[in-house]
Amino acid sequence: MPESLKNIDMRRELLLKRLKYDIPNRVTQALKEDLGGQVNPQMDITSKLFPQNQHIFAEIITRENGIFCGKAWLEEVFIQLDPKITITWLVKDGDLLKTNQILCQLFGPVSTLLSGERTALNFVQTLSGVATKVNDYVRLLSGLDTKILDTRKTLPGLRTALKYAVLCGGGDNHRLGLDDAFLIKENHIIALGSIKNAVNNAKVFNPTLPIEVEVESLDEFKQALSTQADIIMLDNFTLLMMQQAVEIRDKAVMQNAIQHRPLLEVSGNVTQKTLRSYAETGIDYISVGDLTKNIQALDLSMRFCDSRNEDIDASERLKTQSVSEDKWGSN
């Protein structure tokens, strides 16, 4: 397997490990925001209007097309409020959604379902919105080898969640944080004297981590090309400069002028209009901060039903269980 793909796979595994810790903690924090600093549905004064033994069915419905993400977060909300609440899932993370589609059915106390409604929807709407936007970008690159990457431009506290949503939308993850890859930028280069010094220092410090160098000109690109950097980021390059960078890299590889073939990443001035033309230059990655920075939540809602919706064929149900029975099932 190419080293670049190993790095992506390792990053995905690391992300999933971090999520096991992050999901319960982020859900707890969100519930406390809504419930007076406690994870206690009794703090919801409006829901106290209902008797605690009054149970009801509810459905989560999408009001627009999109890509679903957030199953584990919704489950965790109701695990923490009342693990006896049951959920019947009709979709899984990464599924294509159509307007008015039922995503899941819940059954439990009226008061508790209402207490968790907004927190659960906030997570699922946000993550599904990110997955949907990512998928829009990915589909624009149909037939090309270029991959879409996210960035560290994420909402505070939701880094791992948003990066998981990127995967559900068909994108790939850039580094998760400052600890899992080197990214040598302008100020690093200035402080260390040169691109070569920076890369050499990184290799000595930790030879197992990927090294990426950001360049702002073709001259800097040529300097980075002569090092052992794994990835070279072309920051705010014009389309012509991208084409030239690819040609220079490929020529150097063909002539054995460099010992390895670094991957090229484009960053800056990336929009849906420019995306495909950038990819057609032959670059390997396009990183897009907009994916996790400017989020448009998917329109979802929860509604109560008089009884279980019999229109849903039993064979379509992915699972019906107490959410506490399989806390870390299919995400």
Which residues make up each language-model segment?
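Active-site core of metal-dependent hydrolases
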Residues: 234
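Active-site loop ensemble at the mouth of alpha/beta enzyme cores that anchors a bound cofactor
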Residues: 301-306, 310
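Acidic/glycine-rich phosphate/pyrophosphate-binding loops and surrounding catalytic core
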Residues: 2-227, 231, 243-248, 263-266, ...
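Positively charged, low-complexity, intrinsically disordered RNA-binding extensions
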Residues: 237
